[in-house]
């Protein structure tokens, strides 16, 4: 599936969150099975069968416990490598076949400076870019975004 916004395939645009561009995952409420930094790895997700680390099977993605014995959603905060207009979001669940989130949402902030990560995560002025939507497992799930604002965090 190729998503178009104004005739432009947003997946051909630069990934503002990717690590080589300076993106960083500054906060996550859980990373029990796989590290949050995997969210910003460049290129397609990789998987090698029978590779185990101290947290279990090694995946190129962020994996949480999901059922933690407390209410609430899993969330992470990514500081974009460069602030910019977000034309689309790809939720890549490659290699996650039974352990992927059934639905996701993405919100954004534009903030100056470098306040502490916990303060950023706790803010209540996040702007929804992608309302709660269903995603498939082991797939690239692209969603166009129709928003002209410049963002620093998702």
Please place each PLM-identified region on the residue numbering.
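Trp- and acidic/polar-enriched beta-sheet ligand-binding modules for extracellular glycan
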Residues: 2-75, 96-154
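Extracellular and analogous surface-interaction loops
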Residues: 75-87
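A short beta-strand element within beta-rich, extracytoplasmic domains
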Residues: 84-96
């Amino acid at each position: 599936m190729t998503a178009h916004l104004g005739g432009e395939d947003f997946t051909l645009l630069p990934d503002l969150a990717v690590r080589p561009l300076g993106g960083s995952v500054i906060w996550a409420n859980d990373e029990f099975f796989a590290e949050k930094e995997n969210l910003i790895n460049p290129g397609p997700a990789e998987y090698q069968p029978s590779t185990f680390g101290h947290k279990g099977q090694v995946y190129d993605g962020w994996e949480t416990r999901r059922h933690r014995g407390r209410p609430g959603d899993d969330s992470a905060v990514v500081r974009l490598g460069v602030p910019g207009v977000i034309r689309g979001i790809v939720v890549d669940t490659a290699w996650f076949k039974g352990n992927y989130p059934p639905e996701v949402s993405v919100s954004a902030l534009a903030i100056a400076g470098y306040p502490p990560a916990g303060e950023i995560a706790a803010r209540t002025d996040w702007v929804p870019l992608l309302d709660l939507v269903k995603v498939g497992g082991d797939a690239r799930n692209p969603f166009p975004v129709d928003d002209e604002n410049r963002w620093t965090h998702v």
